[in-house]
């Protein structure tokens, strides 16, 4: 099993969610986050004064999947989240040792 964390632009969330549903992903955790990478921040004008905004709004999607669909999920996220512009985000893939569904006690693949 693998955990996929994807940090994407907020306006791409619906597209990514729908595309993942089409490949069989039925659940995910979504968190509003802020951060920066090579994109750094940007300046905003407020009441005539210019301010530097260091952290940019992003969305973090977390899904846990079986090993056989990891590449499909990663490819789907790339295809739907990519704009070709700086700040499109990153995808991280982690090994998952164990999953337990609290309600039923199901474990591993059955709990996903």
UniProtKB/Swiss-Prot annotation:
The name this protein goes by in its record: Nitrogen regulatory protein P-II
Keywords associated with the record: Nitrogen fixation, Nucleotide-binding, Phosphoprotein, Transcription, Transcription regulation
PANTHER family from the UniProt entry: NITROGEN REGULATORY PROTEIN P-II, NITROGEN REGULATORY PROTEIN P-II HOMOLOG
Domain of life: Bacteria
Transmembrane parts of this sequence: none
GO molecular function, one term: enzyme regulator activity
Assembly mode: Homotrimer.
Matching PROSITE patterns: PII_GLNB_CTER (PS00638), PII_GLNB_DOM (PS51343), PII_GLNB_UMP (PS00496)
Modification sites for O-UMP-tyrosine: 51
Cellular component annotations (GO), alphabetically ordered: cytosol
SUPFAM superfamilies to which the protein is assigned, alphabetical: GlnB-like
Assigned protein family: Belongs to the P(II) protein family.
Annotated function: In nitrogen-limiting conditions, when the ratio of Gln to 2-ketoglutarate decreases, P-II is uridylylated to P-II-UMP. P-II-UMP allows the deadenylation of glutamine synthetase (GS), thus activating the enzyme. Conversely, in nitrogen excess P-II is deuridylated and promotes the adenylation of GS. P-II indirectly controls the transcription of the GS gene (glnA). P-II prevents NR-II-catalyzed conversion of NR-I to NR-I-phosphate, the transcriptional activator of glnA. When P-II is uridylylated to P-II-UMP, these events are reversed.
InterPro entries (UniProt xref): N-reg_PII, N-reg_PII-like_a/b, N-reg_PII/ATP_PRibTrfase_C, N-reg_PII_CS, N-reg_PII_urydylation_site
Gene Ontology process terms (BP): nitrogen fixation; regulation of nitrogen utilization
Origin organism lineage: Bacteria, Pseudomonadati, Pseudomonadota, Gammaproteobacteria, Enterobacterales
């Amino acid at each position: 099993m693998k955990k996929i964390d994807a940090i994407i632009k907020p306006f791409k969330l619906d597209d990514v969610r729908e595309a993942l549903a089409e490949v069989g992903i039925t659940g995910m955790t979504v968190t509003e986050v802020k951060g920066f990478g090579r994109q750094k921040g940007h300046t905003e004008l407020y009441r005539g004064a210019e301010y530097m905004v260091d952290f940019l709004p992003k969305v973090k999607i977390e899904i846990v999947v079986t090993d056989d669909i990891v590449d499909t999920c990663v490819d789907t996220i790339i295809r739907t989240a990519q704009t070709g512009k700086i700040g499109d985000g990153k995808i991280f893939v982690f090994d998952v040792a164990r999953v337990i569904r609290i309600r039923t006690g199901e474990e591993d693949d059955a709990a996903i």
